[in-house]
Amino acid sequence: MSDLPEQLRAKVSGSSFYAGMRILPKPEREAMFAIYGFCRIVDDIADDETAPRTARAAALDQWRGQIAALYTGGDAGEAGFLAPAVHRFRLEQADFIAVIDGMQMDVDDYIRWPSYSTLDLYCDRVASAVGRLSVRVFGMERDAGIDLSHHLGRALQLTNILRDIDEDAAIG
């Protein structure tokens, strides 16, 4: 976790994923901590109901720019902690952007009563894209990894949605 900003280290170490990630070999562990940290940051932005939608959208746009800079050699700003994982495991920019785009769907409220195709797109962005990043870290063959990410990501995200349905209904 040495590449992670201090405040992010606390969030990662407090996560239920921490114990599982902690037993990975150091390069994979550090990469997974970075991926988790990124996901946590953009999810927190999307979920911050105290901030106006416009501010949350602007913060997500800033992250899009930082991710782009990470791949073009520009100033990646806060996203700089991802650089070691991106370079070592050849993580794809499109997957990071997909995660941000999924969070944007939360901000824009596109998933309150989605069509099947919108729900599928949302699951791809917020779950399968994370899976695609993860299978690269684990060294899985590309086609098999993409297939696994596709199905497992959707299954896990739909389970997450169903698990939270009562809580979400109470919120409105």
Where are the predicted features?
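Acidic catalytic motifs of isoprenoid enzymes
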Residues: M1-G172
